[in-house]
């Protein structure tokens, strides 16, 4: 049975890679013909992501959309379980959203090209001098009315436990005066584990949208660590509710 799953997963992985290359090529062509970044992001949300989730055997369930005023920009903060998280979030969030990605992603063919063409931001780990510049870029993106999503744990969870949220990048939301939306992901780590495609299995992924956290109260900024702790607690509460 394990051999059969390995063969199946290898075939699906190859098909998903071809699907990804095709959609990215189409998005890059659209950008070259004058389409905006948001158009290319919607292509991912409405075309690429549903195909990836279907190929992986994912049944996506989204809860809490009614809690958010989608006419406003937000910083979305989510727990991180799997590389398929991005596809789930692209599909779940009803607005174009950019991601804060590892700097290594910029060098990956197709993925890096698409990320640059759609205004994604890149973080250089352990590079202290890049932090202030990244926060300014993120704040400018949010202030311009665009949504941004990041994984404040800093890396994917190996155990399924949600690590404490790092607060540094949340300063961008404070500077831009936009709210932070906690997002809970459940099931992605079982569909596509950190260990690789050999352990991949079809299954459900649940996405929960939390209540927006205002970054300013009576004109005064809320401390970013307090925001990180509250977002972390809200994500944990949604996950416990589903347990």
Residue positions per predicted region:
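Short, basic, glycine/proline-bearing loop/turn elements
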Residues: 49, 120-124, 154-155
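Glycine-rich helix-loop-beta junction characteristic of Rossmann-like nucleotide cofactor-binding loops
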Residues: 65-69
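Catalytic core of membrane glycerolipid acyltransferases/transacylases, capturing the structured
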Residues: 20-41, 55, 70-128
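General small-molecule cofactor/ligand-binding pocket signal
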Residues: 61-63, 121
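N-terminal membrane-anchoring alpha-helices
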Residues: 1-61
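Non-catalytic C-terminal accessory region of glycerolipid acyltransferases
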Residues: 3, 132-243
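Generic preference for hydrophobic
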Residues: 62, 76, 99-100, 207-209
């Amino acid at each position: 049975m394990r051999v059969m799953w390995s063969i199946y997963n290898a075939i699906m992985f190859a098909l998903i890679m071809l699907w990804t290359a095709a959609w990215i090529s189409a998005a890059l062509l659209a950008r070259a013909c004058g389409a905006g970044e948001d158009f290319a992001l919607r292509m991912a949300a409405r075309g690429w992501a549903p195909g990836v989730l279907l190929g992986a055997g994912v049944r996506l369930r989204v809860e809490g959309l009614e809690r958010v005023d989608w006419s406003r920009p937000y910083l979305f903060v989510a727990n991180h379980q799997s590389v398929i998280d991005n596809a789930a979030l692209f599909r779940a969030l009803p607005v174009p959203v950019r991601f804060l990605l590892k700097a290594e992603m910029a060098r990956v063919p197709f993925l890096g090209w698409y990320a640059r063409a759609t205004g994604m931001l890149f973080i250089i780990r352990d590079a202290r001098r890049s932090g202030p510049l990244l926060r300014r870029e993120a704040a400018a993106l949010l202030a311009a009315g665009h949504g941004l999503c990041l994984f404040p744990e800093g890396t994917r969870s190996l155990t399924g436990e949600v690590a404490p949220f790092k607060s540094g990048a949340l300063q961008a939301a404070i500077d831009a005066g936009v709210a932070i939306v906690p997002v809970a992901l459940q099931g992605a780590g079982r569909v596509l584990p950190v260990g690789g495609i050999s352990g991949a299995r079809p299954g459900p992924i649940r996405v929960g949208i939390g209540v927006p956290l205002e970054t300013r109260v009576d004109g005064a900024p809320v401390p970013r660590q307090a925001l990180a702790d509250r977002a972390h607690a809200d994500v944990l509460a949604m996950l416990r509710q589903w347990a």
